[in-house]
C-alpha cells in the first residue's frame, strides 16, 4: 500500500490537517508528524540549537507524532530520518493550510516549507492551501473542494507518476467557493503579492518597547509580458491554481550579464 507523510504549519490539532487525513485515509497508509503549536510564516526554519521532543499520539497505530516547538521542516526531517526511517514514503503533503500561499507568500510559508523539506529529502511533495476569503466573503469555510482536489491529484500521481523531475514540488491553492461554483484547475506561475507593511509599537509595564509585525496581503500585481495567468488570477475566477516550484533559486538569465558586470569591476 502507498504511504503518505502529512505535516502542516497550523499545528497538529488544526482542522486542515485532519481534513487532509480524512480525504486520503482510504487511498494510502497515512503518517502524521506536525508541530504541537502553530508555526505559520516560519519559512524553512529548522531547529539546530535546541532539542526536539516527539510525542507519540495514542490510538494512532504509532503513526502520529506531534513535535514540541518543532517547525514543519523539523517534522518532515525527523519523520523521514528517524521516526519512520524504515518507511519508504511515496508522497509528502503539507496542509491543508488555513489561508493562501501565493506569490511571495511561498517564501514565508511554513506550509510550503514542509513540502520543500520533503523534496530536499528526495520524496515527491505537495503543499496545499485553502483560501479563507475572496470575492465570496460570505461563503463559510469548507474543505470539501480541497479534499476533492487532493484526492484527484494523489490518484493521478499514483496512476501516472509524479509530474515533476528534480528538486521541484507542487504548490496548490484552492478558492473559497462551493463545489458548484468551482470552475476547474489552472497550471499557473507564481504571481506578485503586494503587502500592507505595518509595525505596531507597544510599551510593556516596564516602559520598554516591543513590536508586532503586520504583513497583511492587499492585492496582487499583474505579471508583465506574461501570457499565462498567475495563481492570483486563477483564484479570483474560482479556479484551483497548481504551481510548480523549483528549489534552484539561481537566476540563470543573469549569469552572463553578471559576469560582464564583474569583469568591468576588475578593470
Curated annotation (Swiss-Prot):
Its EC number is 3.1.3.5. Gene3D superfamilies: Survival protein SurE-like phosphatase/nucleotidase. It is found in: Cytoplasm. Keywords: Cytoplasm, Hydrolase, Metal-binding, Nucleotide-binding. Disulfide bonds: none annotated. Its cofactor is a divalent metal cation. GO terms for cellular component: cytoplasm. GO terms for molecular function: 3'-nucleotidase activity; 5'-nucleotidase activity; exopolyphosphatase activity; metal ion binding; nucleotide binding. Its main location: cytoplasm. Binds 1 divalent metal cation per subunit. Signal peptide: none annotated. InterPro entries: SurE (IPR030048), SurE-like_Pase/nucleotidase (IPR002828), SurE-like_sf (IPR036523). It catalyses: a ribonucleoside 5'-phosphate + H2O = a ribonucleoside + phosphate. A divalent metal cation binds at residues 9-10, 40, 97. Belongs to the SurE nucleotidase family. Nucleotidase that shows phosphatase activity on nucleoside 5'-monophosphates. HAMAP family: SurE. This is 5'-nucleotidase SurE.
Amino acid at each position: 500500500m502507498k504511504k503518505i507523510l502529512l505535516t502542516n504549519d497550523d499545528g497538529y490539532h488544526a482542522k486542515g490537517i485532519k481534513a487532509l487525513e480524512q480525504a486520503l485515509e482510504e487511498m494510502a497508509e497515512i503518517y502524521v508528524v506536525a508541530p504541537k503549536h502553530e508555526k505559520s510564516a516560519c519559512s524553512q526554519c529548522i531547529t539546530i540549537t535546541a532539542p526536539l521532543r516527539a510525542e507519540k499520539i495514542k490510538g494512532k497505530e504509532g503513526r502520529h507524532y506531534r513535535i514540541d516547538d518543532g517547525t514543519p521542516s523539523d517534522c518532515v526531517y525527523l519523520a523521514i530520518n528517524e521516526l519512520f526511517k524504515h518507511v519508504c514514503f511515496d508522497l509528502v503533503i503539507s496542509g491543508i493550510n488555513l489561508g493562501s500561499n501565493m506569490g511571495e507568500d511561498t517564501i514565508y510559508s511554513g506550509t510550503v516549507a514542509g513540502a520543500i523539506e520533503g523534496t530536499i529529502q528526495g520524496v515527491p511533495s505537495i503543499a496545499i492551501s485553502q483560501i479563507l476569503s475572496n470575492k465570496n466573503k460570505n461563503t463559510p469555510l469548507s474543505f470539501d473542494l480541497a479534499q476533492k482536489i487532493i484526492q484527484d491529484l494523489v490518484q493521478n500521481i499514483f496512476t501516472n507518476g509524479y509530474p515533476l523531475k528534480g528538486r521541484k514540488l507542487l504548490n496548490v491553492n484552492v478558492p473559497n467557493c462551493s463545489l458548484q461554483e468551482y470552475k476547474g484547475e489552472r497550471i499557473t506561475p507564481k504571481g506578485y503579492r503586494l503587502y500592507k507593511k505595518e509595525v505596531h509599537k507597544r510599551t510593556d509595564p516596564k516602559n520598554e518597547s516591543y513590536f508586532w509585525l503586520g504583513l497583511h496581503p492587499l492585492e496582487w500585481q499583474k505579471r508583465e509580458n506574461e501570457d499565462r495567468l498567475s495563481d492570483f488570477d486563477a483564484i479570483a475566477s474560482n479556479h484551483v491554481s497548481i504551481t510548480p516550484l523549483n528549489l534552484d533559486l539561481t537566476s540563470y538569465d543573469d549569469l552572463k550579464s553578471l559576469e560582464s558586470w564583474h569583469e568591468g569591476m576588475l578593470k
